[in-house]
Amino acid sequence: MPTSLPSSLIATALLACVHGAVAAPMSLDDYLALNGPAPTAQIAYGPAPSQYAQLFRPEGSGPFPVVVLVHGGCWTVAFGGIKQMRNVAGALVAQGIAVWNVEYRRVDEPGGGYPGTYEDMHAALDSLQQHAPQYQLDVKRIVAMGHSAGGQLVQWIAGRDKLPKTSPLYRDKLLPVKNIVSLGGLADLLHEKDLIKTSCERDIAQLAGQPSATRPDIYSDTNAADLIPNGSRTVLATGELDTISPPRVAHDYAAKAKLAGDHAEVLILPGASHYDEIAATSNAWGMILVVVRGMLGMENEKNQ
């Protein structure tokens, strides 16, 4: 697996931007109306109603590269979620890429928040690894892509092998996931806590828990920016017109990651809102697809 982003990857993605007539930026209502094909299978990874993943598998024989999708919605049930991600899942399957579309317990569900939401990320990836042979999934070729709150979670996934051993979230055996696409993500819980409060009306304690004698630093096992360097390759793709997670957020995180020694690049999506970032029908999608295919080593394969 390459250890750095190809220098041409972002440039190629920018060239994929559709020129000519530009559609109006998508609204929240446009986003909530998104849908896509039915999954190949729905697989529970825990007993709670929200502890499951949807598998979308291309036709034919594998092994297939995998994209793990983690939806956003401000960590709450109020703003859609896994259903909207089906539109992207369908577009990826058409490229010969399998998709593991993750649902998880959110802060306003029993067991959600800290530590439950993060435990669900562990369990969902364990389930992917367990089911990979049955469905011919190549978990050595894997990208985790998350939108908004899901961006925070996939960036956390990249660093979970650096969790303190004293953390309730620590695990000693993990599926490595080091190729990350964060779409309008809000990953730096400490430095973006005011923005998270403004954009999502989330108190940081819901996402990071309360300090205690055994865990005085609530960010040590929740904040992606505290878990670098971790050997990840991250593209932070943000709509030019994103007001939920403005481009500054991506630039600030990329600067920290690169200073720490990780590979991180910013991709600004021209004319795109926060919701265009996760719509396969948007002008932005072609740029994002170039990044995903490049991370999976498919850049020289015919684009379908």
Predicted regions, residues:
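Short beta-strand/loop motif that positions the catalytic acidic residue
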Residues: 236-238, 242
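N-terminal cap/lid segment of alpha/beta-hydrolase-fold proteins
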Residues: 24-61
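Alpha/beta-hydrolase active-site loop
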Residues: 113-132
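Short amphipathic alpha-helix adjacent to the substrate-entry channel of hydrolases
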Residues: 81-100
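Conserved alpha/beta-hydrolase "acid-adjacent" motif
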Residues: 243-249
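Primarily recognizes the serine-hydrolase "nucleophile elbow" in alpha/beta-hydrolase
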Residues: 126-194
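Mobile cap/lid helix-loop segments that gate and shape the active-site cleft of serine hydrolases
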Residues: 27-32, 38, 48, 159, ...
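Catalytic histidine-centered segment of alpha/beta-hydrolase-like enzymes
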Residues: 272-282
